[in-house]
Amino acid sequence: MSDELKMRLLKELMFGKDVCDHEHHEEIMFLHDFGFVKLYDDNMQFAATTEHGIEELSRLIKLYFVFLN
């Protein structure tokens, strides 16, 4: 899966899109395989449940903000 697709899916998760009804269900499940989870709290925070997921989530968030600037 490309970084571009991962970042798009991450952005959609950040804005609360329902992952169960998403057209890229397989890709989102792939992200979940890395341990990505969404925490439903006021801060819209993310967590990763595996070591690889933590590293990948950190990398994607950094990459996402680089593209914003």
Residue ranges and their predicted role:
Residues 1-22, 62-64, 68:
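Short amphipathic alpha-helical interface segments
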Residues 9-13, 31, 57:
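Generic leucine side-chain signal with a strong bias for well-ordered alpha-helical environments
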Residues 33-42:
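A short, conserved structural fragment
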Residues 51-69:
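Short, amphipathic alpha-helical interaction segments positioned at domain boundaries
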Residues 44-49:
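Minor-groove-contacting beta-hairpin "wing" of winged helix-turn-helix DNA-binding domains
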Residues 25-29:
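Short, hydrophobic-biased segments on the C-terminal half of alpha helices
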